[in-house]
Amino acid sequence: MVNPSFYRHNRELFAAALPDSTAALLFSGEGKRMSSDSEYRFLSDRNFFYLTGIENPGFALVISKINGEVSTFIYAPARDSMKERWSGKRMDFADIAAITGLDVSEVLDLEKYEEKEFELLKNEDVNICLDFSSVMEKPFDLKSQVEKGGRKVTDLSEITTSLRLIKQPHETESIREAARITEEAIDEMKKLIRPGVSEYELYTKLEYEMARRSSMNFAFETIVSCGKNAFYLHHSEPEKDGDGIAMEGSIVQVDVGARMNGYCADISRVFFVGQPQGTDDRRMQLLELIRALRKAAFDFIGPGKTFAGLNSQMYDITGKWLAGQGLIPDNFEEGDVRRYYWHNTSHFLGLDVHDVGPRDKEFAAGNCLAVEPGVYIPEWGIGFRIEDDCLVTEDGCLLLSSGKDSPEGIIVG
């Protein structure tokens, strides 16, 4: 269990940034139906989770600052023995207090939330702060209600984004642990790679190995691509036959992430099926480029640098290599390179796999990034990426995953 002081501290930071005479309203969200009465596995709104540690539907959180005094209340669904018979035991107020670091007196029945909401919406001396980054309808419905009365509503996600961008030790260690679980699962899956193995077999092995290491809510849909399926970057429907079969002389691309304490890993690995046939093997030629890009990327990352600057450096290195292969002209432009370099090199990482933060923001110590240079060459019938996770430090960056990219670990069979 995560130390509740972490969530208490997050709320203190949030409240310190909250303007006076303001009430912030956040919601965990509601379960989503898959079909009929079957539901998807639930994941709380990430800003709500950041402030509470609660991963259950139907909760509301109200943090108010009035005349400098901060009050916090969480509203929880009442226990219902009939619902619990079908869906399992629900937390009682003491359980909720233990997770969130709130006093039990600050945990209230959800029925009281409507009364509190009405009181706040009626009070014109209190400004309302809602989460405009939410995928839920509730904040936007409330925004419409408040604005009908001529009052302005502020966006609390500006506060949570600034907090979530700078990771605390618990957060970086959670990402490190998620990366460890992910890589252990990849290592176990690698043992199955051989000519004739299917994407489906490798996919199920990855998810089994992550689940048995206590990661059930994965960071994103697991990707396993054999051969030319690697040209579909988010190939998340593994095939049992046809193009989904690993062939001698081809590749297997995996892109996968465990989740630990709510935090995501994002790891991509490529494996070569069968021994390369000398220096002319195009898999090895492309691997040499990707390894050079990775080294340059991790050398580049540090405080004050940007995603745009990182991409620019990757395009320059890749462009010179592509020109040397006769694939683009020597006087290439960025557009020439992007015919082969399809995606951004990096993104923020945290409670979301593509975590919050503006893409034009300079890197700062405490940012966590996933770094994934990738090149895809249709003329060669091959393309792949290798991805690792890192923490921006005061003088550069620190890998949170292993950084494996040696040919010895990539060639299988």
Predicted regions and their residues:
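Active-site neighborhoods and metal-handling regions in enzymes and metal-associated proteins
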Residues: 1-413
